């Protein structure tokens, strides 16, 4: 059963806040900024080049969209994982992997 508007808002807000919290150590270590404003999470890099990853909810389709490295990643709610995921990869591990790839760091 698809998420209602209210369920989507609550779950997407919680997912973005969890991502912000869980990426804080990597952000401190790697020197990039995490900005969560108006329901959108931005990962802002100055090195190795000025870049921004944008993580935002898309309410009409009940997905969280990640715009990073010239691509769009669309994560749907996974009842089995109790999180937003793309091909069974949850949001936080996806963002961690994309960030490390961008920074040229191994996991």
Q: Can you say where each PLM-predicted feature lies in the sequence?
A:
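N-terminal intrinsically disordered, cationic/polar leader segments
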Residues: 2-54, 58-107
